[in-house]
Amino acid sequence: MNKIIIGLAIFANMAFLPVKAEPEVKGWKTLDSMGCMMLEECTDGVRQIKSWRDLGPEYGKFSQELDSIFASMDKLGIKFFLADDKYFIGLTRGLYSVDSNNFFANKKYTTKPSRMLQVIRHEGWHAVQDCMAGTLDNTYTAIVYPTSTIPDWIVRGANRTYMKSVAIFEAEAMAAMYSDTTTKDGLAVCASDTPMWEVYPPTPLTTKWLIREGFITK
């Protein structure tokens, strides 16, 4: 009987614990709301996705690719979140954080499995670029493939859509969107004990970076 009373008392105390309030956001679809989501401080309408099964049975046809991607992400400590449109600026479909290495997909633009898959591949490739810069424990990214290997129509699209400083990085990620192996294989290497640059020959610019940071020698 005493055990029951103690148990009820604990439950009663828990019932009256204050609920953690959501941070005050200055405005939706702003840098403030996006930052709040990326810092994992805003959680309303934000859900972590740990498997394609969390997205629904219609993703089963992509299970082999997604199982590999999620397994690599889990090993690397990368988290993937599906969030309401209110957090994203403009027409943003997805985001990758070089600080936390997590990425986020906008619910509004990912209702179709094919669109969601493209966002996962795109943002996942940014993690691969992060890894190519030496380690995920930094805030830098590096080009993996020579620009000449990316289709011209993708490069032109990236140049129209993104700032010049990031266009080439985005062009690579856009190219990865249309491949069922590029992001999967890149993340698998990143999650392995083999350095990225031993599998993907670094470009001259990336080589200079890796030498300067001490990851490889001349």
Identify what each model region corresponds to.
Residues 141-218:
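Metalloprotease/metallohydrolase-associated module, dominated by Zn2+-dependent proteases
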Residues 17-20:
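Sec/Tat signal peptide C-region and signal peptidase I cleavage site
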Residues 72, 127-131, 176-183:
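Structured segments of extracytoplasmic/periplasmic soluble domains
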